[in-house]
Amino acid sequence: ATYKVTLVTPSGTQTIDCPDDTYVLDAAEEAGLDLPYSCRAGSCSSCAGKVTAGTVDQEDQSFLDDDQIEAGFVLTCVAYPKGDVTIETHKEEDIA
């Protein structure tokens, strides 16, 4: 399945198509969006965003704790969409 992923970035909002077996960061790059990242392995917070609608599968991540995940934080480099989802990007500095 392919879902609509809406990315709310500092430079505007864009909606991209993202297959359920493709990481959000990869799909964004394929669509020509320039999102922050570093390790691409789910073990840092450079690519962090915040889910404001919908859900993602980020089981491959190893950086966020349960409280951060409950608050909606997501590592876009290891996040698969589980449906249509809205993510605010560039949220690394908001992670407490």
From Swiss-Prot:
Localization annotation? Plastid, Chloroplast
Chloroplast as UniProt keyword:
yes
Ranges where the 2Fe-2S ferredoxin-type domain occurs: 3-93
Query: Which positions bind [2Fe-2S] cluster?
Result: C39, C44, C47, C77
Mention one GO molecular function.
electron transfer activity
Going by the UniProt record, its keywords in alphabetical order are: 2Fe-2S, Chloroplast, Electron transport, Iron, Iron-sulfur, Metal-binding, Plastid, Transport
Enumerate the Pfam families for this protein.
Fer2 (PF00111)
Family under the similarity heading:
Belongs to the 2Fe2S plant-type ferredoxin family.
Query: What is the recorded name of this protein?
Result: Ferredoxin-1
Q: Which organism is it from?
A: Phytolacca acinosa
